[in-house]
């Protein structure tokens, strides 16, 4: 999942709402009211189908896939959109004449495994709407990031470093809210020709303060920035660790 995606099991929800579709609309409303952003939601009976459905009716639709219409829906999905299929796998599948779920469905589990290895059994289940992926209720974050696509491309260092200062403050808040600290800071720049550049620094010590994050981001910016218009700027922190755990480790020495 990317940073702006999430799964939610609403079978037994604390709100006591009896309709998953109703919950989806409530989430959309809440997100829009709190952060001013739209989101699309997929509702279904397993993770794979919910993920596939979320890509339809963007930017603010709700797509529901029921057991009754699942197979019909799956058969129309392009093979490159199946969960777990990357560029290399997609090319291999296409060379074998498998372009959509319709082409995938007739093949046996054994055939798929023989031709495509571990991906085969997963595709066999997915195309039948039987994906057995379990929802992970608690997962440690590997990174936290934020980025901004600019209304107008710019070479103005003041504007761009201003965003970095905002990002650093926002990331400090996220870290403290979750009792985390980081060691790696990554700057992302995308120019007017859609060339994306990233550069990272990993520190020896953990940090979680705005001024520390901003200082490193500024250093990266000065190393990366050339006189070309920037369309997007982003800042990500990783190598995260719980601050309570760090404190306990330090107390041992």
What are the language-model segments listed below?
Residues 1-151:
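Nucleic-acid-contacting surfaces of polymerase cores and analogous helical-repeat interfaces
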Residues 5, 232-234:
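Extracellular/lumenal ectodomain signal focusing on beta-strand-rich modules
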Residues 9-13, 190, 238:
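Solvent-exposed residues in well-ordered beta-strands and their adjoining turns
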Residues 81, 91-232, 239-253:
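DNA-contacting surface of Y-family translesion DNA polymerases
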